[in-house]
Amino acid sequence: MRQDIILKPWQIELTTNSTNDNFEESTFFTGNGRMGIRGYLPFWQEKRTFETGLFVAGIFGEIKPGITDFVNLPTPVWGNIECDGHPITLSSPVSSTLDMKTGVRSQSFLAKSGESTLNIEHHVFCSMSDPSLLVQRLSFSASRTSNISVHAGIHTACCNCPVPDDQVKENHETIKLAEPAQHDMCKDSVDCTFSILGTGLIVREQMFFHTSFSDSEDYISDDSLGKQWHGILQSGQKLVLEITTRITTSRDIDPLIGSNEISDTYDELFAKSSLAWTSRWSESDIEIDGAPDDQSAVRYNIFQLITSCSARDSSVSIGARGLTHTRYKGCYFWDTDLFMLSFFLYTHPEAAKSLMEYRVRTLPQAKENAKKMNNAGARYPWMTSFDGSEQCESWDIGASELHITADIPFAMQQYFDATGDENFHLQAMEVYIETARFWYSRCIIHPDGSADLMFCKGPDEYCGITNNNLFTNCMVKFNLDLAIKAALRLREAYPNRYSKLSLCDEEVLAWHSLRDNLKECRDPQTGRYLPDETFTRLEPVDIKTLKTDDGASYHHVCFDRLQRYQVIKQADTLLLMSRLPKKFTLEERLNAWEDFEPCCLHDSTLSFASHALFAAQNGLQEAAEKYFKKALYLDLHEIMNNTGKEGLHLACLGETWSSIFFGFLGATFDGDTPVFSPVLPSGWKALRMNFYWRGESYRLMVFEGRYSISRI
């Protein structure tokens, strides 16, 4: 756990003596949604080939046949400084600042070389006005007149160290996924093209340099290329080097790419990017009175959701770690659809549509995946990357974590309900129908009409391979209901589409029967809901014997053993009830909390926020606030001791936002007008925010339990 980040209204700050603090590198990530860069210290002689972290959405390379990794690209945020012919050494702590209002990360420190002390500052941002631009400014001064040498360019030796899917295994073998194909050196620029292993993708990095210090010379070595400058720096004189890099790829579709000039100055590009950030914050900010640390942390969560969403590119989604790390090979999970979508849906509907269109685009791969599993229709893979094919290498998870195929139609319907986007709804209807076909072929339907869903896992991955997981079965029923309504709508209004999908009344009636007869597990004595058929047969255990802090228990308890204890990894039944609250009575929801909250290990970073949301929705304010604090500061305080090692947890960021909007603010959208029932966390005196609903923008203000809402 860490508590050394200083929180300010629009900034976070950290001072450290380390030049390679992976916690800082994760938390001080900055980006623009299309690309981003971890908060490592540049212009330092230490070369960390796989630990830097420059990522562009959708750029994956093949590490084995059919399996990809998120490419750690050759980074232009790199260089070194020499003074009087000697490398510099750190002589003060490194001070880092992340400005969330503008996306600029700043780092400053003192360095010594011989008798000279250098005061070094570095600023970097990824432009929000032109998502292909990465902009830097390096400046430093010397305590005495010194002979200075500066190298800047592209660290071409960057590589990947693929992280195994298994959370208790480690890998130390690296693989280079971006090979230089060609380069061109001009007076004030460097242009280098890289080919990505196995996927045929091309990445181009064009660097433009501006400094008045001296003329540049070309610099090429085995692991880098760029420019170098030599000259005398007078005592008190400041050397300023501005570097703008345009990063383009062979798969770009964002219309804003190339909209700014690479030759513009740092200040000119900063002004344009800041204007775009101002617009984005006007849609997304949550203003809180009375809780300054929470205010900063909420803005941090929002900032990091924005910086990992390529809002205008529907060929990509958001990985479990966004653009902040290669954990889980950068793949897209159900995290996006169930935990992140709501934030974008109510603050940036265009981005939400893009995320849903990614699932429409990959429907053919989902159909192929179902076919491989000897099923009909479409089964969405558990983990996907650039082409929508299955990337999960854990056979039990990949084969049995079926619920994603129902989660995606659920998310699509959420998008339609909030926007009324009829054109998208027509596309979504095909997804509803093809996924319903999968469920009908995957379930076991008995002669009496009853049905079971066998060999599955719900969100609680500690249940072993089980039968009739309640979360999955109820989401399947929701999916089937969507398909039934879609089929009727197509038959009446779009008969050609109905015919093209080979629909018939008999198939739709079969979905009716499955929806009505698929099993929901209950305790035969009490009638209370159960997570699945096997939960009560597992061995009870005092969870205090399994863990003593908020770190995951699987680091010291064998995973096989965890599968046989009566414990829950993360919200499962409670998650279902937060997503489909109308299906359950308040008594049923509170009974579920009483039954399952005490035995939850919270071994997933999804869990705290989901419990906060459920508790806030159901009047459990004290518990809601307890879990909300853990979720809100999960990364900023490294609550689970894995932020530095694995990157930021985007699903937690998204669900934390939902715990505010749907939990503490009590947002509901049953009719044409949004309704709220706010109960703010302790210390929050007032709250203000904007949101979208069905094409309208609204302003919400909450004060002392009252609220007002107005159209903007």
What is each of the regions a protein language model found here?
Residues 1-26, 30-31, 35-40, 44-327, ...:
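Acidic/polar, glycine-enriched structural segments that form the non-catalytic walls/loops
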Residues 78, 87, 291-299, 336-381:
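Carboxylate/His-rich catalytic cores and anion/metal-binding grooves
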Residues 22-55, 339, 387-391, 445, ...:
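C-terminal capping/lid segments that line or modulate ligand- or cofactor-binding pockets
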Residues 330-361, 410, 488, 503-645:
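Active-site core of glycosidic bond-cleaving carbohydrate-active enzymes
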Residues 300-307, 358-365, 431-442, 478, ...:
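Alpha-helical scaffold segments in carbohydrate-active enzymes
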Residues 309-324, 350-410, 416-427, 440-450, ...:
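Helix-terminus loop motifs that line ligand-binding clefts
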